[in-house]
A protein has these predicted regions:
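Serine-hydrolase catalytic machinery in alpha/beta-hydrolase-like enzymes
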Residues: 1-70
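Short glycine-rich catalytic loops that host catalytic nucleophiles or stabilize transition states
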Residues: 38, 158-164
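Catalytic histidine-centered segment of alpha/beta-hydrolase-like enzymes
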Residues: 45, 163-175
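Gly/Ala-rich beta-loop-alpha elbow adjacent to hydrolase catalytic centers
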Residues: 78-87
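Acidic catalytic loop of the alpha/beta-hydrolase fold
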Residues: 136-141, 165-166
Length: 184
């Protein structure tokens, strides 16, 4: 599953970073779903400031597991910007539910350009399966902001030199970084 950037700023399942994450997953023979959040393109509903969007992802996971029973093997979640923040909530809730049900959690969570902002729903704390990738020159969410957020959790961040928020001209390098994070 790969979650897209903020719907109110043009984020859709067709975003190039979302597609790059999805392609990295597909290259590892993982079934991938890139759903649009509510109110985006042909999706019903309206933006819900991160609350309903997490519900959207849960519904998509449920559909994916029912449609492709084999997905019960490896479960990878990815997200870009706002989608990465939503992915943190899925990962945290999945961990809580899976522990209670005696089921495995997500195998890997890839968070690219984590879109944390003081006026939005905060990102959830991360578990050990999460990997963060952030551009050194991110002009939307400063690297220092993400470092400050990750420090109390002692969570490492893979920093892509000279990369901005949208990784212009660096998608092949981003895909390589994602693949490294999937297998470290």
């Amino acid at each position: 599953m790969v979650a897209h950037p903020h719907p109110l700023f043009g984020g859709t399942l067709d975003n190039k970073v979302v597609q790059t994450i999805a392609r990295a997953f597909v290259s590892q023979s993982i079934v991938v779903l890139r759903p649009n959040f509510r109110g985006v393109e042909k999706s019903t509903g309206a933006h819900d400031h991160g609350m309903g969007e997490v519900d959207d992802l849960w519904a998509a996971w449920k559909w994916l597991i029912e449609k492709f029973p084999g997905v019960r093997g490896k479960r990878w979640m990815g997200g870009f910007s706002f989608g990465a923040v939503m992915a943190t909530h899925i990962a945290q809730q999945w961990s809580t539910h899976s522990i209670a049900a005696g089921q495995p959690g997500l195998d890997r969570v890839i968070l690219v350009g984590l879109g944390i902002a003081p006026d939005r729903r905060p990102a959830a704390d991360l578990g050990p399966t999460a990997r963060l990738i952030h551009g050194e020159l991110d002009e939307v969410v400063a690297l220092k902001t993400v470092l400050d957020w990750a420090a109390p959790q002692r969570h490492p961040i893979l920093v892509m030199p000279a990369a901005g928020h949208f990784f212009h001209g660096q998608l092949p390098f981003l895909k390589d970084c994602i693949l490294r994070c999937l297998h470290d």
